[in-house]
Amino acid sequence: MKWESYSHPISDIRDWNKNNRLELQPDFQRHEVWTKAAQIMLIDTIIRGIPIPKVYIKSVMIEGNTYRVVIDGQQRLTAILKFVQDQLPLKRPYSGEYQDMVFSQLPPDVQNEILRYKIDIHRIFRCAG
């Protein structure tokens, strides 16, 4: 198995999801298990600009289009996508200046910083066999 490492901004991940090019829950993935508090603290980490753990994906080409299957990182990506889609308000345990806000209520410069935040991704590109 070979891996390729690269970084993508959250805006790319949002676009992959919006265009149905991101599979968050393949058969081997568990369903959403993180608490709201854990999801909110991940968003707090991103707002502060602190790196988060890598995400692992497998890219699949279908009819010339790249689809991404999440191998590890589903809980993190789900929380991020919920936040940028205004489905996760910054409630407790978050206690910063954006308390109780959803993404679209944040100042535009903060929204842009979040969308530009880079997530390290390892992509499987070849399997032995």
Task: Set out the residue ranges of the language-model regions.
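Basic- and aromatic-enriched surface patches that contact anionic nucleotides/nucleic acids
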Residues: M1-D12, L22-G129
